[in-house]
Every structure is written in C-alpha cells, then in structure tokens.
Amino acid sequence: MKYEFSTAISSFCAITGLSSAMAQVKAAGYDSFDFPFSVYSVGFQAPMVQQDWRSFLRSVKELCRQLELPVSQGHAPWLQDIPSDFHYVSPDELYHRCIEAAAYLGCKHLIFHPVRLRERIDSLSLKERIHDWNVRWFHELIRTAENYDVYINLENTFDSHFVQKAGDPSYPYTTGEDMLRLLRDIGSDRIRLCLDTGHANNSHRDIPAMIYSMKGELATLHLNDNFGLKEGSFSDIHLFPGKGQISWAPIMKALQDISYKGIYNIEPIDSLPKVDDGERIRLLAHGREKLKEMLSLQQV
C-alpha cells in the first residue's frame, strides 16, 4: 500500500525562510507539507495581515510549483480566546482570509484549535458554556468554507496552562467524545477532525481508542511524540514519532483498521530550529523513514 507523507515547517520556517524550508522538506523526501498560516499571520509585519496578502500567496504558490511540493493541509492561527465574561466575539476576518488562502494554495484541509477559556474549568456547566461559544464561533466560518470548498479540521487540545485541579471535569476538547460532539453540534459537512497525538498523550488519553471513535471523521494528523504532561514545565515538545513515550504500533494499527485515507503528517519541533540545514534535512528524512517503517510493520 502506498502512503503519502507530509511534515509541518512551523518550527523552523521563520529561521530559514520559507523557500529554504520548503526545499529542505522536498530534499528529505516528503510528498507535501503543512502550511503554517499560524506563523505568517502573527505580528503587524506578518504577510497574511497586509493589504497585499494575496501577492504573498502568489509567491508561495509559485514555490510549490517550482519544487513540485503541494500544500496538503494548513494550520490556522489561534488569535482569539473566550473572554472571561463570555461576551461573544465573531471570528476575526483573518480566519476567513486563511480559508480563502488555503483554497488558493490547493489545500482542502485547514486545521483549527477550538477557542479556549484561559481559566480553570471547574464545573460541567462552565464546560458547556465553552462548548456553546465554540459552536457559535465555528458556525460563522461555515459559509466561507463552503464558498471555497475547504474543510475545517478541529484539533484536540490539552491543558497547556495547568489550570485544572483534581476532581474537575476533563479539559475541553481533549477527548474523542468532546471532539465528535463539537463536530456534530456545528452541524455541517464542512467539519472534520485532526488528531494531535502529542496533545492526546499530554491529556493521558488512549490514543488508539480516540482514533477508533473518530472513524469516518478523521481527516488529518499531527503525529508527534512527548513524555507526557509535567506540571511547571513545557511538555508539548513535538518530538519525532518514536523519540518519546508514546506507543506507536497500536496507533498505526488503529489508523489502518479505520481505513484512514489521509496523509501521514508529522508535526516535529525537536531540535529542528537549532541545527544547520544539512542536519535538519537528515532529521526530517529519518523521521519520514521511521514513520514508513512503523506503517510497514503493520503489513506483516
């Protein structure tokens, strides 16, 4: 069986420059890449917030053509939080812009984090308010997604700010059930799911069970490894698969059992921002081969 592999470049593209980052991904043997709208949308000088943002996209599309490296998925920015008083704020125009941009680059799947409340969620009623806020917020993006034939992919999260305490409800959108409920309550065929394995591990989830629960809705992957959530330290370290504590064989089996048809995308940070170009290519190539090996073992 032939698999397609892609990688994120968000951890190093600002250091190397976009054209060099894409060239390194191509040199490492990947079929496509995950375009980081999140990187190019932050800051007053970011190209996606400029009036001539479409000229930036034309240059990206030309690079894709020259390198024969398509954009298979993209990552939207996460610029909005739920206000403490829960007053509603519509999606920033930039989110609509990113959907249009994804379509222009030939990218069908744009990944979004659910909008979070950066406070402790100590009751089910508070968690329900967060859910209702997200349903309303994402529903406002549906028409744009329909107009540009793009799918909004909802990514599972984790308690990155260590706000939860023992006895509290699970942090919102860390379970397969939460993700499926958000998808269904938004109520559009423009919504799909993205599984981030590192986030799931940081939330102490059974990752294969999440995959089985998402059958038919799972469209994209953020495959990465870590050593689990450690309070007081940054734990979302995005190692290459196989370099942390996650057990990968059951994950690959689950993906094959549900007949996952999407691209196998890794989202590494690891040491990629710190090494030279040659070493970065080597690490990316090794990560791809390791992933390919994990998949081939399921064919035996």
PLM feature segments, named:
Residues 1-6, 11-31, 92, 106, ...:
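Histidine-acidic metal/acid-base catalytic patches
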Residues 76, 113-115, 155-158, 197, ...:
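Short, well-ordered beta-to-alpha junction loops that form the rim of enzyme active sites
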Residues 34-43, 72-78, 114-116:
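Short, conserved active-site loops that position catalytic residues or coordinate cofactors/metal ions
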Residues 58, 62-66, 81-192, 202:
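Active-site acidic/histidine proton-transfer and metal-coordination neighborhood
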Residues 35-59:
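Glycine-rich, proline-tolerant flexible connector loops at the mouths of alpha/beta enzymes
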Residues 1-8, 72-81, 117-121:
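N-terminal small/glycine-rich loop or linker at the start of catalytic domains
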Residues 44-46, 84-85, 121-124, 163-167, ...:
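Short acidic, glycine/proline-rich loop/turn micro-motifs
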